[in-house]
Amino acid sequence: MYNIIIIVLSILAVTAALVFAAHFLPSRKLDLENGSPYECGFDPLNSARVPFSFRFFLVAILFLLFDLEIALLFPFPQALFIFNSSHVLYIATLFLAILLIGLIFEWTQGGLDWAE
């Protein structure tokens, strides 16, 4: 019981010391550069409607889909010890075959061609 009281009091003391230091220590003066917004190198006063490559968007969505599907493969090694291993291997092979068919389809449709 006394340990909890000591911990709470020490946390309160550290918090009070930090608040006291933040209140009484001098703050830095802001100049023009510190007061202006920084938008990753873009001018924030221009229009936000910039052209965006649909090709990049398609590749990003495909990456997310295939990444999620690959993450679904993580439980299969553990399932080999729990269930019938031939059944689990059949399901994993079927799952990978579906992924491969989807990848080949996207490749033949030109979804992975970066330059046209």
From Swiss-Prot:
<keyword id="KW-0813">Transport</keyword>
<keyword id="KW-0830">Ubiquinone</keyword>
<keyword id="KW-0812">Transmembrane</keyword>
<dbReference type="GO" id="GO:0031966">
    <property type="term" value="C:mitochondrial membrane"/>
</dbReference>
<keyword id="KW-0520">NAD</keyword>
<dbReference type="InterPro" id="IPR038430">
    <property type="entry name" value="NDAH_ubi_oxred_su3_sf"/>
</dbReference>
<feature type="transmembrane region" description="Helical">
    <location>
        <begin position="4"/>
        <end position="24"/>
    </location>
</feature>
<dbReference type="InterPro" id="IPR000440">
    <property type="entry name" value="NADH_UbQ/plastoQ_OxRdtase_su3"/>
</dbReference>
<feature type="transmembrane region" description="Helical">
    <location>
        <begin position="56"/>
        <end position="76"/>
    </location>
</feature>
<keyword id="KW-0679">Respiratory chain</keyword>
<feature type="transmembrane region" description="Helical">
    <location>
        <begin position="88"/>
        <end position="108"/>
    </location>
</feature>
<dbReference type="GO" id="GO:0008137">
    <property type="term" value="F:NADH dehydrogenase (ubiquinone) activity"/>
</dbReference>
<keyword id="KW-0472">Membrane</keyword>
<keyword id="KW-0249">Electron transport</keyword>
<keyword id="KW-0496">Mitochondrion</keyword>
<comment type="similarity">
    <text>Belongs to the complex I subunit 3 family.</text>
</comment>
<keyword id="KW-1278">Translocase</keyword>
<keyword id="KW-1133">Transmembrane helix</keyword>
<comment type="function">
    <text>Core subunit of the mitochondrial membrane respiratory chain NADH dehydrogenase (Complex I) that is believed to belong to the minimal assembly required for catalysis. Complex I functions in the transfer of electrons from NADH to the respiratory chain. The immediate electron acceptor for the enzyme is believed to be ubiquinone.</text>
</comment>
<dbReference type="GO" id="GO:0030964">
    <property type="term" value="C:NADH dehydrogenase complex"/>
</dbReference>
<dbReference type="Pfam" id="PF00507">
    <property type="entry name" value="Oxidored_q4"/>
</dbReference>
<protein>
    <recommendedName>
        <fullName>NADH-ubiquinone oxidoreductase chain 3</fullName>
        <ecNumber>7.1.1.2</ecNumber>
    </recommendedName>
</protein>
